Structures are given as C-alpha cells and as structure tokens.
Amino acid sequence: MAAEGEKKMITLKSSDGEEFEVEEAVAMESQTIRHMIEDDCADNGIPLPNVNSKILSKVIEYCNKHVHAAAAAASKAADDAASAAAAVPPPSGEDLKNWDADFVKVDQATLFDLILAANYLNIKGLLDLTCQTVADMIKGKTPEEIRKTFNIKNDFTPEEEEEIRRENQWAFE
C-alpha cells in the first residue's frame, strides 16, 4: 500500500514493449484497467496488446488531464461550498473543453487508433470525444465528400447507387 501522501503507481505495457508508470487514479479512468487492478492483476504491470506506445501516451495524457481537472474542480467546489458561488461550475470546465478540442486535432490514423484504444480500454469520455469528432467530420457532407474525406472507394455501380438512393429517399431530403 502506498504511504500517506504518496501516490500508488501502475505500470502499463504497450504492444511494442514500452512501459509507462502512471498514477493509479489515472489508470483507473479505464474500466478495463480498473477491473484488472480490483482483481489484483496489476502487480507485475498491465499488458495492453492492442495499444501501441504512441497511442498509449496520448491516452495517458487524456486521462491525466481529466483526473487532475476533476480533482481541481472538486477542490474548488469544496472551497466554495459555504458560498453561493458553489452552484456555478468551476471555470476549468470550459478550459477542459478547449483542451479536449485541441487534443483531437490529430491526423485521421491517430484519431481512429484513439477510438480503438478508448473502446478497448473502456474509457467512455475519450470514446465519446473521439467518436463525436468523426461524426462532426461527416456532418453535412454528401456521400461523395465523405468518401473523399475518409479515402473510401465507391464500389457501387451507378445502378446500385440509384437503387439505394431510391430505397432511402427519406435520408436525402
């Protein structure tokens, strides 16, 4: 057990063999890792065969930011508990939204790898953020624009495409 004031550290091992020492609270943002810690499977490090070191470092950066922002917000709320200002959300909420927006300004391959990692590690906030980013990339675009954005080849014949448009006319209105 970690001594008073000392933070317990967890070792995460990426698919390419790199090891990351992270605070237990940060690692527990992942429900997958949380269950491993709760089941006492974290003593020799936690192998993450589906996440490479580049993506794992980004995931840790996200979890770190969110854990410390939540702690700061809780601390601020405790300080303000006696005053009417307690009902007002801490200013860090807007800062965190801006940080999140900057965090997902990455190339498509990294974004998709972050989605896969967030899903595998069961980090709801990160999965929601990354999926919403992809949804925003699609919103308001024609099928042709979406194909171009994501480099998707159109393998429909003109006849098949027309049939799909006819069957799904409601979606194109």
Curated annotation (Swiss-Prot):
Subcellular location: Nucleus
GO terms (BP aspect): jasmonic acid mediated signaling pathway; protein ubiquitination; SCF-dependent proteasomal ubiquitin-dependent protein catabolic process
SUPFAM superfamilies found in the cross-reference section: POZ domain, Skp1 dimerisation domain-like
Pathway(s) it belongs to: Protein modification; protein ubiquitination
GO MF, one example: cullin family protein binding
Keywords: Host-virus interaction, Nucleus, Ubl conjugation pathway
Disulfide feature: none
Pfam families reported for this sequence: Skp1, Skp1_POZ
GO cellular component: cytoplasm; nucleus
Residue ranges of the region described as Interaction with the F-box domain of F-box proteins: 115-173
Coiled-coil region list: none
Record's subunit section: Part of a SCF (SKP1-CUL1-F-box protein) E3 ubiquitin-protein ligase complex. Interacts directly with MOF (via F-box domain). Interacts with rice black streaked dwarf virus RBSDV protein P7-2. Is able to form the SCF complex together with CUL1 and the viral P7-2 protein. Interacts with D3.
Entry similarity comment: Belongs to the SKP1 family.
Function recorded in the entry: Involved in ubiquitination and subsequent proteasomal degradation of target proteins. Together with CUL1, a RING-box and a F-box protein, it forms a SCF E3 ubiquitin ligase complex. The functional specificity of this complex depends on the type of F-box protein. In the SCF complex, it serves as an adapter that links the F-box protein to CUL1.
Protein name in UniProt: SKP1-like protein 1
Organism: Oryza sativa subsp. japonica (Rice)
